[in-house]
Amino acid sequence: MIILSNKPNIRGIKRVVEDIKYRNQLIGRDGRLFAGLIATRISGIAIGFLLAVLLVGVPAMMSILGVI
């Protein structure tokens, strides 16, 4: 008959489980970040275009019209 220990050494198993949890969280975080970037892509391009028009277009129009 084989005698089994009452307290098996499971430190290695716990370490592997923690590593798997950590890696899973990293993969999930990257997936959520990428999904958020894709979802806000169009609005970000539109806001950037409008900001560029304001920063470049308004002073150009003012100099053409002779206001400045």
Swiss-Prot record:
InterPro entries attached to this UniProt entry: MeTrfase_F, MeTrfase_F_su
Q: What does this protein do?
A: Part of a complex that catalyzes the formation of methyl-coenzyme M and tetrahydromethanopterin from coenzyme M and methyl-tetrahydromethanopterin. This is an energy-conserving, sodium-ion translocating step.
GO annotation, biological process: methanogenesis, from carbon dioxide; methylation; one-carbon metabolic process
- State the oligomer form and interacting partners: The complex is composed of 8 subunits; MtrA, MtrB, MtrC, MtrD, MtrE, MtrF, MtrG and MtrH.
Q: Which organism is it from?
A: Methanothermobacter thermautotrophicus (strain ATCC 29096 / DSM 1053 / JCM 10044 / NBRC 100330 / Delta H)
Q: Where in the cell is it found?
A: Cell membrane
What keywords would UniProt list here?
Cell membrane, Membrane, Methanogenesis, Methyltransferase, One-carbon metabolism, Transferase, Translocase, Transmembrane, Transmembrane helix
User: Which reactions appear under catalytic activity for this entry?
Assistant: 5-methyl-5,6,7,8-tetrahydromethanopterin + coenzyme M + 2 Na(+)(in) = 5,6,7,8-tetrahydromethanopterin + methyl-coenzyme M + 2 Na(+)(out)
Q: How does it sit in the membrane?
A: Single-pass membrane protein
The identity of this protein, by name, is Tetrahydromethanopterin S-methyltransferase subunit F
Q: Name one GO molecular function term.
A: tetrahydromethanopterin S-methyltransferase activity
Pathway info? One-carbon metabolism; methanogenesis from CO(2); methyl-coenzyme M from 5,10-methylene-5,6,7,8-tetrahydromethanopterin: step 2/2
Q: What is its main location?
A: membrane
Keyword Transmembrane helix (UniProt): yes
EC top class, in one word?
A: translocase
Q: What is its EC number?
A: 7.2.1.4
**What protein family is recorded?**
Belongs to the MtrF family.
Q: Which GO terms describe its cellular component?
A: plasma membrane
Q: Which domain of life is it from?
A: Archaea
- Bilayer-crossing regions: 45-65
